Amino acid sequence: MFKKLFFASFIFTSILNSQEPNLLGSLLYMEVEADVETEPVFAGDDAADDMCVLENLINPEKSLIVSSDKKFGIIVYDLEGNKLYDYEVGRINNVDIIPSKSSQDKYLVAGTNRTYNSIDLYIFNSKGELENNIVREVVPSLKDVYGITF
């Protein structure tokens, strides 16, 4: 009995101490607190939804906010909340962004599009300009496309 108890205690302690704590946190995200509010979206109501940050690593103050308007498309704001661009691409519900691996000035934005029941991929430049809709993949097996992340 003593051997079994000792062995179980040893295993439990080993598991608890087998990983060092992550004191650095994640390098993939940063918590921020809003100081300003963006201009309202076209549709009003509760149409403003998901957003992501187009992070400008060279000039952080020139980073942008890419947001979805669930009844219109994609809206791009500066960090002061001023609307820079609006793109009528369909009823975009959620958006996410990653920097392009092939170009320092390009970003890949994904969005779920309820108009076409599709997942859309777009190329944006660092100024927030939509350069290309590279993919619109219709997902007929889903009743409603909802949510996306890279």
Residue ranges and their predicted role:
Residues 34-44, 82-88, 133-139:
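A short beta-strand motif characteristic of beta-propeller blades
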Residues 44-57, 90-101, 140-150:
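Beta-rich, blade/repeat-based domains predominating
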Residues 117-150:
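Asp-box/WD-like beta-propeller blade repeats and closely related beta-sheet repeat scaffolds
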Residues 9-18:
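Hydrophobic h-region of N-terminal signal peptides that target proteins for export
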Residues 19-36:
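Blade/loop signatures of beta-propeller domains
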Residues 79-117:
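Blade-loop segments of beta-propeller domains
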Residues 73-75, 116-119:
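Structural signal for beta-propeller blades
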Residues 35-72, 93:
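Beta-strand-rich domains and repeat architectures in extracellular enzymes and scaffolds
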